[in-house]
Regions:
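Acidic/polar helix N-cap motif
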Residues: 83-86, 142, 166-167, 200
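A conserved helix-loop-beta module that forms one wall/lid of the active-site cleft
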Residues: 124-194
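Arg/Gly-rich low-complexity intrinsically disordered repeat tracts
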Residues: 11-17, 24-34
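ATP-binding N-terminal substructure of ATP-dependent carboxylate-amine bond-forming enzymes
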Residues: 34-132
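Conserved ATP-binding module of the ATP-grasp superfamily
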Residues: 155-159, 177-183, 198-234
Length: 234
């Protein structure tokens, strides 16, 4: 029950994903029966360094592995040179090292279905994975999906229109209906670089075309045009 309450309070309403990760892991550690646990943390960024640092402080942790990790995580755990989206290699590592829990830091392996991979494999299904399913990860992995979700559930959000190469004329018309500045967002994951804020209509039209033509690869096959909102991000 304690773990369920943590999820209710922190997901998906919280936008502080680092704090959410740490608190959920702490909740999980507090209810699992293992006296000592081997934990695998997926990722290689600063977020994973912070999560690894905190997990390493738990008296319930025996071994902490980070895949692939970085120089910072190497100071608090053991790096395993495996890509975070190489599910077959992750499976082999988990089974070989008696891993009791997997914590997922980056969005990419979640969007690709690492949670589902574990759940659907008989040899892995009993190992908790901290992170949403592939379906749940769409809220982060697709801005078009997330905006449609907000509209369906009456969650306040900026006006928007999703554009592909097939309806780019509608995109130009929607841009013209908006006041400057103009916000263009690649639908998919683009390593945090898929959002452009343009000051003029001409710039916005040009960048919309460039995005649809592969500026961010497959991530910008669909582009979400949003109304610009001024304020403090939650």
């Amino acid at each position: 029950m304690r773990l369920q309450l943590c999820f209710i309070l922190l997901h998906p309403l919280s936008t502080d994903w680092l704090l959410t990760h740490i608190l959920i892991v702490n909740c999980q550690l507090s209810i699992v029966n293992y006296k000592k646990m081997n934990i695998l943390l997926l990722g290689s960024g600063g977020r994973e360094h912070a999560i690894a640092w905190k997990i390493s402080q738990s008296p319930k942790v025996d071994k902490l592995f980070i895949a692939p990790g970085n120089a910072g995580t190497a100071q608090v755990g053991t790096n395993a040179y495996i890509k975070a989206d190489d599910f077959a290699a992750i499976k082999d590592f988990v089974l070989a090292n008696d891993v009791n829990m997997v914590v997922v830091g980056p969005e990419d392996p979640l969007v690709k279905g690492v949670y589902d991979f574990f759940k659907n494999d008989a040899s892995l299904a009993g190992i908790p994975v901290i992170g949403p399913s592939k379906a749940g990860a769409q809220l982060e992995g697709s801005k078009d999906f997330a905006k449609a979700f907000m509209m369906r559930h009456n969650i306040p959000t900026a006006r928007y229109k999703s554009i592909t190469a097939e309806n780019i004329a509608e995109g130009y018309a929607f841009l013209k209906s908006l006041p400057a500045p103009y916000v263009l967002k690649a639908d998919g994951l683009a390593a945090g670089k898929g959002v452009l804020i343009l000051e003029t209509l001409e710039e916005a039209k040009k960048e919309l075309g460039d995005m649809l033509n592969g500026m961010f690869g497959d991530a910008s096959k669909t582009v979400v045009i949003e109304e610009f909102l001024t304020g403090i991000e939650c």
